[in-house]
Regions:
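N-terminal signal-anchor/first transmembrane alpha helix
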Residues: 1-22, 27-34, 39-42, 46-54, ...
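Short, membrane-exposed interhelical loops at transmembrane-helix boundaries
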Residues: 75-94, 360, 429
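A structural signal for multi-pass alpha-helical bundles of membrane permease subunits
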Residues: 59-67, 150-470
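Pore-loop/selectivity-filter region of tetrameric P-loop cation channels
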Residues: 27-29, 79-87, 202, 206-207
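Transmembrane-helix bundle segments that line or gate the permeation/cavity pathway
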Residues: 37, 59-76, 106
Length: 470
């Protein structure tokens, strides 16, 4: 990448052409600044370097030494001859070793990057002094970072947040996928260790338990993609149509209608989805209404409902549950999309609409030739985001089907999956109910790959089309 190349080239030039103070600052950050008359900077960078080295010496090194095995000493009770009591031995905690090792790797990378920046900074000071110019003092440097380089100040905390709450957990997730961390290997009572690609073979290979996970992954991935597609585009087009109807000049009280549809967004999903689950249960009010209206008998007659059922299994049979979930998601998602579409439709250039009307275009032609392309060009990135969000849409699936849907598919059941599971709900169930962290980590990687590939491909095509309405 150009940015990385420029950074390393700048460091290489600084280290090659720098004086002794510049070169030595790579190892002892403060010495370079002392040599170039920057005492406050020297104190601050020495403090930062000292904290980093302290962490590595007392927390990083002991755990990195055990990183290859993730521990060898199990927790057990031993007899202490001093106290004449049974006490817990000095055992290894595999997860603590893994966690601290990953943090240590990040700290090491950060220290190296910081050392390179210190060398580059010292080289700049060296050149300023060689030119006979005066270098900034500490207060002047602070003013620079509050003015010309204020963007650096603003980005510091967000970058730290990304490292701590995104990069480190991601590294741990990837690492766990290569271990046997599950219910039989739970720290601190037991140890887990590295198993290489075994978990990936379990997911994609064949034979025994492997075949059930491979079968389940294919089924769950297929439903996840089908769900994400319909959940995204039904709400997208539904929101557009609803926005057009409400904003039409013939519609009475548009503000009232817009407010009524907003209720589904205003009420938390945790409340609405649990209520809806009760409405659509086998003995719920909706089934009672369908039976009284003769719909249940009609479905029996046309073969869409098994003769032995006296109710419509909205949330208890795979096909019905998938259809019902998508319909409920339309009810939840269309009002939100309506608001976005309303804003976009109001910003379509009036001259485009007027030109089309003069050319004799009817409303349908104007929608497909002007409004829809404009909406797609503006909301393209939002559609990609919505698709990824729906791939990870935990609430709708889990709250509607948990404790209601029971699978009869034994292969799915053996791998703790259900027909209506998304990858993310399957992952959640593996961790929270069955403590199968190793396979959950593999699924987490698969979710990331699916979302990343889709996002990259979509943005590639979006960038090609973005100039159409510019």
């Amino acid at each position: 990448m150009p940015g990385e190349k420029n950074f390393f080239q700048t460091f290489g030039e600084a280290f090659a052409k720098g004086d002794i103070f510049t070169k030595v600052s790579f190892l002892v950050w403060g010495l370079g600044y002392i040599g170039h008359g920057q005492l406050m900077k020297a104190l601050l960078v020495t403090l930062v370097e000292g904290l980093g080295l302290y962490f590595l010496a007392f927390y990083g090194a002991p755990n990195l030494a055990k990183f290859g095995t993730l521990g060898t000493v199990k927790m057990e009770m031993v007899f202490d001859v001093t106290t004449m009591k049974n006490v817990v031995n000095n055992y290894d905690n595999s997860f603590e070793i893994l966690l601290m090792s990953m943090i240590s790797f990040v700290v090491i990378a950060a220290l190296i990057a910081a050392a390179m920046m210190v060398v580059t900074s010292n080289y700049q000071l060296q050149k300023i002094r060689a030119a006979g110019k005066k270098t900034n003092n500490f207060l002047q440097d602070i003013k620079v970072y509050l003015n010309e380089k204020f963007y650096v100040t603003l980005l510091t905390l967000p970058v730290l947040g990304v490292v701590v709450f995104t990069i480190v957990p991601l590294f741990i997730l990837i690492a766990v996928a290569f271990t046997n961390y599950d219910q039989q290997h739970m720290p601190p009572n037991d140890l887990f260790t590295w198993v290489g690609l075994t978990n990936f073979f379990t997911l994609f290979g064949g034979g025994g338990m492997t075949s059930t996970f491979g079968y389940s992954f294919a089924k769950v991935l297929t439903w996840t993609l089908v769900w994400a597609f319909f959940a995204t585009f039904t709400t997208f087009f539904g929101g557009i149509l609803l926005a057009m109807f409400i904003n039409d000049k013939k519609t009475k009280c548009p503000k009232l209608w817009r407010t009524l549809f907003m209720v589904t967004i205003a009420v938390p999903q945790f409340v609405t989805l649990l209520l809806v689950r009760n409405f659509f249960s086998n003995n719920g009010i909706f089934n009672t209404m369908m039976a009284n209206a003769g719909v249940t008998d009609f479905l029996h007659n046309i073969g869409l409902l098994d003769k032995g059922l006296s109710y419509i299994p909205f949330l208890t049979q795979p096909g019905w549950a998938m259809f019902t979930i998508i319909m409920i998601n339309i009810w939840i998602g269309v009002p939100y999309q309506m608001l976005i579409s309303t804003g976009v439709l109001m910003n379509i250039p009036a001259d485009m609409i007027e030109a089309a009307r003069i050319d004799g275009a009817n409303p349908v032609q104007m929608f497909f030739r002007i409004k829809l392309p404009y909406l797609l060009s503006v909301q393209g990135p939002s559609l990609v985001t919505d698709f990824v969000r729906n791939v990870n849409n935990f609430n709708v699936i889990y709250l509607l089907t948990q404790d209601v849907f029971v699978t009869n598919n034994q292969q799915l059941a053996q791998s703790n999956a259900k027909e209506i599971d998304l990858l993310v709900t399957w992952l959640f169930r593996l961790t929270q109910e069955y403590y199968n962290y190793k396979m959950a980590a593999v699924l987490g990687i698969m979710v990331f790959i699916v979302c990343a590939v889709f996002t990259v491909v979509c943005f590639h095509f979006i960038n090609k089309k973005e100039a159409t309405f510019s």
